[in-house]
């Protein structure tokens, strides 16, 4: 499953059949700073309410300092789901993604990365954001490009939809 996940080059991913762990090697703080960073991130993620509730942040201690990491259950990435889901299900998922996107934009003046690999579905069908980052608001520039890309990519839509 880890091979189906997209990632930054500086992020190391480890997974088994139940959990995924992401090591954020671009961050290497002193232990105290790492814990502060994690506390702030946990609080922000709680407020945003777009991340899986079982996602946990932690610090791995090394000789160089504290490496920030997180762990969460394995979810089905949306770009994989799109390969087999029918168009009605896809429309529901895209609607949920847009709700998340516009809620974050309106409330926090930030944007999500709308790439399908940044979203995943739990076993109840609920969508969660996987990217650990939110991005500066860009007046819908990325949104337009993302929607165009999605429409071209999703060959699930037929003439009856």
Which residues fall in each region the model found?
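Acidic surface patches and DE-rich sequence motifs
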Residues: 14, 62, 122
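Conserved structural core of kinase catalytic domains
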Residues: 18, 25-27, 37-42, 48-96
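ATP-binding glycine-rich loop module of kinase domains
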Residues: 1-42
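Conserved kinase catalytic-core segment
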Residues: 89-112, 116-119
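Catalytic activation segment of kinase domains across protein kinase-like and atypical kinase folds
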Residues: 110-160
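Short, solvent-exposed secondary-structure boundary motifs
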Residues: 1-5, 48, 107-111
């Amino acid at each position: 499953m880890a091979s189906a996940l997209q990632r930054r080059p500086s992020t190391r991913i480890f997974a088994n059949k139940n959990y995924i762990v992401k090591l954020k090697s671009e961050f290497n703080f002193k232990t105290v700073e790492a814990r502060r960073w994690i506390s702030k991130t946990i609080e922000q993620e709680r407020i945003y309410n777009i991340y899986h509730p079982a996602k946990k942040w932690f610090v791995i201690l090394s000789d160089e300092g504290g490496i920030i990491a997180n762990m969460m259950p394995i979810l089905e990435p949306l770009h994989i789901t799109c390969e087999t889901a029918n168009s009605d299900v896809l429309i529901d998922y895209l609607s949920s993604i847009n709700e998340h996107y516009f809620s974050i934009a309106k409330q926090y003046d930030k944007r999500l990365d709308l790439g399908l690999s940044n979203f995943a579905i739990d076993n109840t069908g609920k969508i969660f954001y996987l990217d650990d980052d939110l991005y500066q608001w860009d007046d819908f520039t990325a949104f337009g490009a993302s929607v165009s890309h999605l429409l071209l990519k999703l060959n699930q839509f037929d003439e009856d939809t």
